[in-house]
């Protein structure tokens, strides 16, 4: 199994990207990894791993590039060439920590949208207080969604949670402004009715305040609401850890307490670090495409590659297609 990796995407490229790829190649003997990007910058970081190859490119899609224009004009960019490896069947999946919009465009225009999918969805796995985590989709691939799209998101999330995350009977929740059945706008009300008709384990509406409590294994939303909720969770977590740091360094007694609590705080931070779950999968394409966080370090890239491998091993794309045809 070959996995293509955009070595030039992200804040710490190419060093941390290559390190993560080396970790994954050493850990999973059944994969080969193709690093795509500027070979002169990549080569110094590659240290003797036989199952790592490099494809040289001389263009990079930058964070501030307009996504669709960049994908169409920068044909020799690391991201576009990465997607072409998948399209041509030389790679089974691909990963990038680069420009999110450009990756979605490359996924749609190069890898291609699956025939049975109306709208792709961007789906990270976020941590919960019980350590189980939950799949959240859509968080920004499409700001608008029809009820039928939300139903498809639920099915895709179900397949992923069951086959990759090992949840036997995933609980599906619909993000809404209240838990009562009739809450929400016309889109969510209609989506609620559609989800009730499926064979999925639909538990009803869920509120944003309960997401980190582990109320559901899969939460579906339109891309606008999903992205707002995701950014709120990220911002709140950063603010809380910043506040804790200020409090625990504010005096001698606080610093002594911090020394005692340091192992516990490190464990808490690790538990809430969603890079441990991999990247955000772009569901609805012809092959697994993973968006790693822009600030990904080697460990995050390792987990994104692990995630891509598991999606291929468990044939998540084929299973989604079969489930949609059966629905």
UniProtKB/Swiss-Prot annotation:
Protein name: Phosphate acyltransferase
SUPFAM superfamilies in the record: Isocitrate/Isopropylmalate dehydrogenase-like
Function noted in UniProt: Catalyzes the reversible formation of acyl-phosphate (acyl-PO(4)) from acyl-[acyl-carrier-protein] (acyl-ACP). This enzyme utilizes acyl-ACP as fatty acyl donor, but not acyl-CoA.
Disulfide bonds: none
Subcellular location: Cytoplasm
Pathway note: Lipid metabolism; phospholipid metabolism
Record field: catalytic activity: a fatty acyl-[ACP] + phosphate = an acyl phosphate + holo-[ACP]
UniProt keyword annotations, A-Z: Cytoplasm, Lipid biosynthesis, Lipid metabolism, Phospholipid biosynthesis, Phospholipid metabolism, Transferase
Gene Ontology BP annotations: fatty acid biosynthetic process; phospholipid biosynthetic process
Position of the signal peptide: none
Gene coding for it: plsX
GO CC list: cytoplasm
Lineage: Bacteria, Bacillati, Bacillota, Bacilli, Bacillales
EC id: 2.3.1.274
Description of how the protein assembles with itself and partners: Homodimer. Probably interacts with PlsY.
Family classification: Belongs to the PlsX family.
GO molecular function: phosphate:acyl-[acyl carrier protein] acyltransferase activity
Coiled-coil boundaries: none
């Amino acid at each position: 199994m070959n996995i293509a990796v955009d070595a030039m995407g992200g804040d710490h490229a190419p060093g941390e990207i290559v390190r993560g790829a080396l970790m994954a190649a050493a850990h999973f003997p059944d994969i080969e990894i193709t690093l795509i990007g500027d070979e002169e910058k990549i080569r110094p970081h590659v240290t003797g791993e036989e199952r790592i190859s490099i494809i040289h490119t001389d263009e990079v899609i930058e964070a501030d590039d307009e996504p669709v224009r960049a994908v169409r004009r920068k044909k020799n960019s690391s991201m576009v060439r990465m997607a072409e490896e998948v399209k041509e069947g030389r790679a089974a999946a691909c990963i990038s920590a680069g420009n999110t919009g450009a990756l979605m465009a490359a996924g749609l225009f190069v890898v291609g949208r699956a025939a049975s999918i109306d709208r792709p969805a961007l789906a990270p796995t976020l941590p919960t207080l019980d350590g189980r985590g939950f799949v959240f989709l859509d968080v920004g691939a499409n700001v608008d969604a029809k009820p039928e799209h939300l139903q498809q998101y639920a099915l895709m999330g179900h397949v992923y949670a069951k086959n990759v995350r090992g949840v036997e009977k995933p609980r599906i929740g619909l993000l809404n402004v209240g838990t009562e059945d009739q809450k929400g706008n016309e889109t969510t009300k209609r989506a609620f009715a559609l989800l009730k008709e499926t064979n999925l384990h639909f538990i009803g509406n869920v509120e944003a305040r309960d997401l980190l409590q582990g109320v559901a294994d899969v939460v579906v939303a339109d891309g606008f609401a999903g992205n707002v909720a995701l950014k709120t969770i990220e911002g709140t977590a950063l603010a809380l850890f910043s506040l804790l740091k200020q409090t625990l360094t504010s005096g001698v007694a606080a610093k002594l307490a911090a020394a005692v609590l340091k192992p516990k705080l490190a464990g808490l931070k690790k538990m809430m670090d969603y890079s441990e779950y991999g990247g955000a999968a772009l569901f609805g394409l012809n092959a697994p495409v993973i968006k790693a966080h822009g600030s990904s370090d080697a460990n995050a890239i390792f987990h994104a590659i692990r995630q891509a491998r598991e999606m291929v091993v468990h044939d998540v794309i084929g299973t989604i297609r079969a489930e949609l045809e059966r629905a």
